[in-house]
Amino acid sequence: MAILKASEIRELSAEEMKGKIAELKRELMKEGVNKSTGGAPSNPGKISEIKRTIARILTIMNEKEAQAKNA
């Protein structure tokens, strides 16, 4: 999966964001298993980039929730 930029994430609906998080978590799990079994990573920075993207999505979701409460 391609890494998403914040501007791309902001255009997604809440359901799409949840779907992306689930997809990224599956990918992260797959990469973690590959790493723990001693396999060579296809891209060494991929795990941290996936984690960063998940955090980015969660942050934007929380921002949107906070705006909805204040509005």
Swiss-Prot record:
Taxonomic classification: Archaea, Methanobacteriati, Methanobacteriota, Methanomada group, Methanococci
Domain of life: Archaea
Keyword Ribosomal protein attributed: yes
Family: Belongs to the universal ribosomal protein uL29 family.
Keyword Ribosomal protein: yes
GO terms, molecular function: structural constituent of ribosome
Keyword annotations from UniProtKB, A to Z: Ribonucleoprotein, Ribosomal protein
A Gene Ontology cellular-component term: cytosolic large ribosomal subunit
The protein's name: Large ribosomal subunit protein uL29
GO BP annotations, alphabetical order: translation
NCBIfam families, alphabetized: L29
